[in-house]
Amino acid sequence: MRVLGIVVEYNPFHFGHLHHLEEAKKLINPDYVVAVMSGNFCQRGEPAIVNKFARTEIALKNGVDVVFELPVVYAIQDAGGFALGSVGVLDRTGVVTDIVFGSESGDVTFLRKVANLLTNQTPEFEKTFKRHLKMGYSYPNARKYALMDVLSNDVEKLSKSNDILGIEYIKALIKYSSDIQPHVIKRIGADYNDEQFKGKFSSASAVRKAIKENKFEQTKEALPEWTFKILEREFSEGRGPVFLEYFDFVIAMFRKLKREDFERIYSFNEGLDLRFYESARESGNLQDFVERVKAKRFTYSRIRRAIFHVLFDMEKSFVELSNEKGPQYLRVLGFTKRGRELLKAMKKNSKVPIISTASLYRNVLEEAKKKIAEGKVSWEIDESLYIWQFERDLLASDIYTFLYPNKFQRKAGMDFEYKVIEMLG
């Protein structure tokens, strides 16, 4: 049995995503497709345009069999943390055999070479990397320039977002000693960061920008039928669109904090705590705040992620433990009729417990502890980390719904109100 694993955000699902999914299926010819998807917040440090259940529905309508949620602790980290979580979820299903991801270079051999270099760092690389950090470069840029110095060739492959993420996926496969085989598909269409609307193969960034500018009807060109229909439903009922600009209220929260309060939160080092502390006292909105914090070593994405690290109380110790031990559960968001068959196989093969009903997450943990004690499974579950990871997912949902355009839709408890999306027709 071949099971294809893909890592997605679908913010929102567009024709470029559909192309990737169809090409991945042609490449692997899988029996099933499993997606691990960011929940209500995405890796660039932004809220998803619609909630995770709507995006799960879109994924299932377009050919995915099972959708798992990427815990928010990983979803709002840099490429390395994001990959540790997403590959961790796919590996811990116990059934995924292949992972396919987009790549600007289309050169999986080169990506493997870089991943191995970063995993087993040479003294030459470490020295060069530290030198670039001291020069004031951000972590990702310092690493890129160090790799360019060491490898000398193929430098353009180290600056593209999909290739960078692909390297991190392979590093994560190495860390987990995973049997999952990596494959790449050469990326087509607009660049990930291109906000110019270009018809059928516009980027997700361009689609979101068009929606923000009240040009939703125009996005029909770039969106499969079911994506447009479901977005239209969510928007009409006031459950979207949700944008980063809606989070101005965090400035007031930051003004309550002392500098040392920021220091205990993940990603606050290199003076970022002081810049947050001072900028909160000078800024009138979130956009102004981000611009004041911006510096050579702090990318916009890092600043935005740090905002949510504070908002979700992401303590350094628990995030670092999450990166060390990986996801402690598999949260099912939705499945098709075929996906239901695969979930049955997963229950026999998974390396961590599976959560289908959010309200029963503690019961699932107790049942897992019982199975471990009886020797029925060989899982290694960190009880406090399991609870911390899942309760951060719950908190992220509760904060997300507060930003819905329709105030009557803003109540907490999304994860308990929504059932797993079952598409059995």
Curated annotation (Swiss-Prot):
It is an enzyme of class 6 (ligase). GO terms for biological process: tRNA modification. One of its GO terms (molecular function) is ATP binding. It catalyses: cytidine(34) in elongator tRNA(Met) + acetate + ATP = N(4)-acetylcytidine(34) in elongator tRNA(Met) + AMP + diphosphate. The keyword Acyltransferase does not apply. It is found in: Cytoplasm. Its EC number is 6.3.4.-. Belongs to the TmcAL family. PANTHER family: TRNA(MET) CYTIDINE ACETATE LIGASE (PTHR37825:SF1). This is tRNA(Met) cytidine acetate ligase. It comes from Fervidobacterium nodosum (strain ATCC 35602 / DSM 5306 / Rt17-B1). The lineage of its organism: Bacteria, Thermotogati, Thermotogota, Thermotogae, Thermotogales.
